[in-house]
């Protein structure tokens, strides 16, 4: 009875706090009380994982991230003693809006959000100046429920633009007026309800595809705008296997774009990089390509040797080139000199090398 009353309090509080977000912020009853055997051994359970996005005509989005987490044991208590959220300061701003702890003994604690901290995020392989907002919760006990909301403004993909500043234009995506997102629908903890809702201007269209799984989707008209909602329930952690592909290629995910065709994003990306000179020739690279393809008779032999050389010699390491990082490739001279880059730069290096071969260039 004690736990039922605590969860009832959570529902009442979230219904009030999330009233304007509608479907994206509703949650189901606590199944850890109804089916405890299903969640035995898990450190924590996400009762709700919800994101609601309001898209502006420029393509910039205002994100409301709502999460309700139940602590199941002492390991879960330790893991959740500090809340963390990653963001890119060059394209977004994020802050905790509200954090409430519903204690197993019936106490309700509203944390002082002015105590939140903003630190440089730990980095490995990619060093683009990512940040983390953090909120210290302190001691938790099994049965406690954490209920918090994060507000974020900006965009998610196409990554970095110009320098940091107070200019609101930094929140507008490089492909101005277009919204694009990839939303993982897999989890690392059991999740009772996961929701992604995006609200766009009436004049915009949105195409979407759900891969490697199923969800419930709907489109409604709300206050002169279109609202797309995607819901998945009773999600269990995705099991990994040795040497399996990345979860983006194996687990449930949602992809969406406001462009008329999927190809429009790629065509825009290609033009940006051709205009920038990402594939411009340099003598030392031409010399290396001539050396590698010497004696190779067929087009596929040339493609194979160049692909292997790029894979072996351009290491994965993301060093920011400043303005344009994230949606503009590092040019060939930079990649060939530094012998490193992220996935887009490695692919760009291979494309540039293929352009040096007359017969392979047509299939670059």
Label each PLM-derived region with a short phrase:
Residues 307-312, 316-336, 346-352, 358:
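Long, intrinsically disordered, low-complexity accessory segments associated with secretion
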Residues 61, 140, 190, 279, ...:
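Conserved structured core elements
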Residues 1-23:
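Bacterial Sec-dependent N-terminal signal peptides
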């Amino acid at each position: 009875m004690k736990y039922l009353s605590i969860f009832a309090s959570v529902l009442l509080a979230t219904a009030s706090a999330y009233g304007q977000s509608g479907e994206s912020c509703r949650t189901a009853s606590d199944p850890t009380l109804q089916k405890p055997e299903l969640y035995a051994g898990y450190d924590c359970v996400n009762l709700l994982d919800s994101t609601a996005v309001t898209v502006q005509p420029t393509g910039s989005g205002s994100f409301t991230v709502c999460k309700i987490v139940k602590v199941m044991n002492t390991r879960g208590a330790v893991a959740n003693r500090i809340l963390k959220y990653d963001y890119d300061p060059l394209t977004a701003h994020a802050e905790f809006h509200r954090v409430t702890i519903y204690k197993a003994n019936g106490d309700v604690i509203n944390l002082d959000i002015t105590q939140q901290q903003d630190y440089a995020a730990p980095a490995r392989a990619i060093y683009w100046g990512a940040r983390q907002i953090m909120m210290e919760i302190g001691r938790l006990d099994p049965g406690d429920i954490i209920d918090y909301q994060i507000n974020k403004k900006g965009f998610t993909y196409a990554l970095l633009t110009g320098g940091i500043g107070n200019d609101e234009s930094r929140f507008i995506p490089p492909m101005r007026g277009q919204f694009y997102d990839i939303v993982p629908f897999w989890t690392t903890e059991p999740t009772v309800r996961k929701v992604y809702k995006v609200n766009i201007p009436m004049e915009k269209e949105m195409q979407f595809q759900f891969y490697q799984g199923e969800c419930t989707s709907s489109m409604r008209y709300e206050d002169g705008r279109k609202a797309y909602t995607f819901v998945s329930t009773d999600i269990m952690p995705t099991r990994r296997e040795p040497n399996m592909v990345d979860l983006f290629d194996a687990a449930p995910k949602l992809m969406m774009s406001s462009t008329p065709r999927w190809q429009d994003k790629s065509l825009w990306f290609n033009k940006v990089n051709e205009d920038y000179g990402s594939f411009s020739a340099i003598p030392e690279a031409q010399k290396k390509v001539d050396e590698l393809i010497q004696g190779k008779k067929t087009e596929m032999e040339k493609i194979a040797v160049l692909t292997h050389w790029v894979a072996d010699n351009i290491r994965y390491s993301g060093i920011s080139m400043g303005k344009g990082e994230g949606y503009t490739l590092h040019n060939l001279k930079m990649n060939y000199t530094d012998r490193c880059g992220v996935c887009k730069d490695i692919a760009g290096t291979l494309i540039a090398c293929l352009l040096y071969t007359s017969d392979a260039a047509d299939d670059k």
